A protein has these predicted regions:
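Long, charge-rich intrinsically disordered scaffolds of nucleic-acid metabolism proteins
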Residues: 2, 76-196, 205
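Phosphate-backbone recognition surface of nucleic-acid-processing proteins
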Residues: 201, 206-283, 319-321
Length: 321
């Protein structure tokens, strides 16, 4: 593959086994194995000053992103939701790996000035993210198995052993999470966040992991990073219903929502939750509002490295959700 002297803007669709790449508008997309060796070889063919738009897919995009950044290229990681909305905006119906690679290249070419370049996460971030996701998948599988096998008496002993093994694996993952948090020097931040009523170990880990990933101007930016901000479609006098943007890590959002359910039953948040229910909010809406409040408070504690002081919270109507 000949090396051009002109920098390119490439799109990279990532999957577990391979990467599909659109390296220039007038070329056909091609695939390479998603391995360290193959990625390193391809990056050597790129001209200096080139940029890559890579779709965030679980953790399958990380090897390419890290190697490309280390090699001096500008990397933009695009989440799937944003890419989907861009596809709709240009009325593109086809969706294959090749089409996605071309779409990423086009998106980078047209929108680059408004995009923020990707930088590697701090030490421990990737390990924490992987462990949280693996635990979530394990819990999901265990729950599904318990539901589907609940009435089966014939294989009850076998299922009991399997369920016990899965629970042990879950506990092992949580133990490793604690070790990684300690190795990354995040114990103090974790302790601060866990002081919030309703916030347990796993939710605190997710919030600390999110906070360490970027520099946030304020709590609004942190809430938006978590995908807990509200977006509203509007045209003229018409306005649609507000919906969560759902950017960012879905597992952290799930943990935060679960924390709000737990928190709504505490003395600290009972009045807050009841206030929004009396205003006519549905249960889910009230819990999301509480989840956002928890996220904002966690942000404040981490940013100022302060401990939670319950006496400063007066309850009732929130000044800022």
């Amino acid at each position: 593959m000949a090396i051009s002297a002109i920098p390119i803007e490439a799109g990279v669709d990532s999957a577990k086994e391979e990467l599909v790449i659109q390296s220039a508008p007038d070329t056909k997309p091609f695939a390479i194995p998603n391995t360290r060796k193959a990625i390193k070889a391809w990056l050597k063919t790129l001209p200096k000053g080139s940029a890559l738009a890579i779709e965030a897919t679980s953790t399958y995009h990380m090897e390419m992103a890290e190697q490309a950044h280390a090699a001096g290229f500008v990397v933009y990681v695009v989440d799937g939701l944003r890419l989907s909305k861009y596809r709709e905006s240009i009325a593109l119906r086809a969706k294959t790996d090749a089409h996605d690679a071309a779409l990423l290249a086009r998106y980078l070419s047209k929108e680059r000035s408004s995009l923020k370049a990707w930088t590697p996460p701090p030490a421990g971030h990737r390990k924490i993210q992987v462990l949280l996701r693996r635990r979530a998948k394990l819990v999901e599988v265990r729950s599904m198995l318990r539901m589907s096998w609940s009435g089966d008496k014939l294989f009850a002993p076998q299922f009991k052993r399997m369920d016990k093994a899965l629970k042990q694996a879950e506990l092992a993952l949580e133990k490793r999470l604690r070790e990684v948090v300690k190795e990354a020097g995040l114990e103090d931040q974790l302790r601060r966040v866990q002081q919030l009523p309703g916030i347990g170990f796993l939710t605190a880990v997710g919030l600390v992991m999110s906070f360490m990933r970027g520099e946030f101007a304020d709590s609004d930016a942190f809430v938006a990073y978590l995908g807990m901000d509200i977006t509203v479609a509007q045209s003229g006098k018409w306005a649609g219903r507000g919906k969560l943007s759902k950017r960012g890590d879905s597992e952290v959002r799930r943990l935060l929502y679960n924390a709000s359910m737990s928190g709504s039953r505490t003395e600290t948040w009972k009045q807050f939750y009841a206030h929004h229910m009396k205003r006519g909010k549905k249960t889910t809406q009230a819990l999301v509002i509480l989840a956002r409040r928890l996220a904002r408070l966690a942000y404040g504690l981490m940013r100022h490295q302060a401990d939670w002081r319950p006496e400063i919270y007066v309850g009732g109507p929130p000044l800022h959700n």
